[in-house]
Each structure stands twice: as structure tokens, then as C-alpha cells.
């Protein structure tokens, strides 16, 4: 099971990282964008027992980026 999660996680990262980074950069600028995207992927890794890689994963990723960006901007 763990090997399967790692393979799926790597594929997810390769598929979505560039687009998420572009989106985050548009929201918060280059300085904070990479940190936000990495935070989202770290959170997925930490919650691997409860994460489901279904049809809604793309929406989940982009919504997570948006939420983290808004929270960051609120606290600046």
C-alpha cells in the first residue's frame, strides 16, 4: 500500500506542480508561491492515510493553494 501511495504521490506532483506554482505566483508573487505549493504537498504526505486520489483531487489542490494564499495575504 505504501509503495502505491508513493507512486501516486509522485505522479500527482509531476502532473500538477507547475500549474499550481503558476497559480500561486499569480496570487502571492514569486517569493511565497513555492512555499505555498510545497506546504500543500507536505500536507498531503502527512495525511496519506486519509487522502483519496479521486476525480476531485485537482479541485482540492487548487482550492488548497487559494486558501493558503488568502491566509498568507491576510497576515502580511
Regions picked out by a protein language model, each given a short descriptive name:
Residues 52, 66-76:
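Arg/Lys-rich amphipathic alpha helix in sigma70-family domain 2
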Residues 2-10, 21-39, 49-52:
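Short, charged helix-capping/linker segments at alpha-helix termini
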Residues 22, 35-42, 55-67:
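Structural recognition of an alpha-helix C-terminal capping motif at a helix-to-coil junction
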Residues 12-16, 20, 65:
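Hydrophobic/aromatic residues within well-ordered alpha-helical segments
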Amino acid at each position: 500500500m505504501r509503495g502505491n501511495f508513493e507512486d501516486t504521490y509522485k505522479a500527482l506532483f509531476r502532473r500538477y506542480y507547475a500549474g499550481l506554482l503558476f497559480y500561486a505566483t499569480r496570487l502571492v508573487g514569486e517569493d511565497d508561491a513555492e512555499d505555498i505549493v510545497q506546504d500543500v504537498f507536505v500536507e498531503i504526505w502527512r495525511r496519506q492515510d486519509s487522502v483519496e486520489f479521486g476525480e476531485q483531487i485537482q479541485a482540492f489542490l487548487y482550492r488548497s493553494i487559494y486558501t493558503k494564499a488568502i491566509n498568507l495575504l491576510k497576515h502580511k
